[in-house]
Amino acid sequence: MEFSKNMVPSEAGGNVKNRERPAIIIGAGPAGLTAAWELQKAGCPSVVLEKDRVVGGLARTVCFEGYRFDIGGHRFFTKVDAVNRMWHEILGIDLLRRSRLSRIYFKGKYFNYPLKFLNVLFGLGLKHSSLATLSCIRAKARPRLPEVSMEDWVINRFGRVLYETFFKTYTEKVWGIACTEIRADWAEQRIRGVSLSSLIATMLLFRRGDQIKTLTTSFYYPKLGPGQMWENVRSRLAAAGNPVLTGAEVTSITHNGHLITEVAINGGEESERFPVSQVISSMPLRELISKLNPPAPSKVLEAALDLRYRDFLTVALIVNKAHLFADNWIYIHDPSVKVGRIQNFGNWSSDMVPVAGHSCLGLEYFCFENDDLWSMDDCDLLALASREVSVLGLAPMAAIVGGTVVRMPKAYPVYDAVYRSKLRIIRDYLDCFSNLHPIGRNGLHKYNNQDHSMFTAMLAVRNILGEEHDIWAVNSDCEYHEEMDEASDMVDSESRI
């Protein structure tokens, strides 16, 4: 994204080019570091505050005994040209082109993802497939209206049989709540552009060129994992005098009712205070509201507390066998195991695995912070993951030679029945602060991808430099346009949530 010469810094919180009052960016994930990068390109100083000891957020890469793994696999795929340019600018030849293969594992069989009609037909068998087709016809003839829940949305497009076969178990494993409690807009965002009828039509009409919106047949991936991207950005920011401070937890955000004036980190004797011109925040909205000083109105505080999150942990297993399976990752729909998804990081990049003939698997478990799974000892989680990968037939227990566990709180904002009304209350209040800019997945409480988070950061910087974009309205559901000049096409027609 290029900044035109006629853009000027916003005066809302003072001159953003004043190094005495830099822009403060909360969070060093893709959104926060992208914001710092774009400000640097515009000649504006910033300080990034990250409470963890490493950068990258959910897009970090962890190194264990030389083996690298993601906190969930991160494909680098976008139709936003500015995001694509940034990836290539930072990574250069280390940004690899990879073929995508991901499948569903269900009752001992593999199914293509997204679903393909013939694959489903032969995988389920004639009887089950016939029932699925009749169920879909019935759903089309008598759709569930109004379409409120994720269950409504999926049944209307696939019928109840396929919903219960492929969607219900996995979705409830991921979110920890019933599909009837998940809003339909989550399904619209994550499963868009596909239905059983469209799959059948594609097969019968031989429309081989048609691409389902959620499907990409290839993607980019950094040689050493997504953390390589964000470590590189951090280094370049620091070299230009724009520090990224880790272990810097925000404890207080002071305001005067319409401007943020100061951000404090790490309370007590080590407290440090930053006077600010602008604040860009990717921290969870619940935490942002709780840090405001003076406190937000009780109605806003209560709304923030009602926002829910799903937490996540990865068990990385080192296996002394190669070529365990061809997929980048596998979705585990089988209800007999707790694991939700399994990554094979050597299939993302061979440089993630330092020893020839070995593999590094990432078993992903979805949980709530402090529940039984989250609270298990690491040794028990390693034993659980080893048993489950063996039961699934993906790796023999005897071949597992090591492993580690990484926990990630607040990985996914939950789209439950009340989140939209609570988010409206929070947004209306935050709109009072002219120099506060929420961005990213948790900053906006939107279940979006890495490129979408980066795009919201780019728009926030444009706003600081004098443009006007409604970041809350950025629509991660639609087809992205190639140029940032067409950013207006990426926002919902209804800008309010």
Q: Where are each of the predicted segments found?
A:
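C-terminal lid/capping helical subdomain adjacent to the catalytic/cofactor pocket in oxidative enzymes
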Residues: F3, G13, P409, D416-I497
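N-terminal Rossmann-like FAD-binding beta1-loop-alpha1 element of flavoenzymes
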Residues: R21-V48
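Glycine-rich FAD pyrophosphate-binding loop
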Residues: Q40-C63
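Mid-domain catalytic core of redox enzymes
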Residues: A42, A248-A395, V406, R420, ...
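Dinucleotide-binding Rossmann-like beta1-alpha1 core, especially the glycine-rich loop
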Residues: E65-R142
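Feature captures the FAD/FMN-dependent oxidoreductase FAD-binding
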Residues: A82-S99, R103-Y113, R157-E164, R236-T246, ...
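Active-site/ligand-binding neighborhood in enzyme catalytic cores
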Residues: V120, G125, S130-I253, P275
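Conserved mid-domain beta->alpha element of the FAD-binding
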Residues: R144, S277, S281-L288, W374-L381, ...
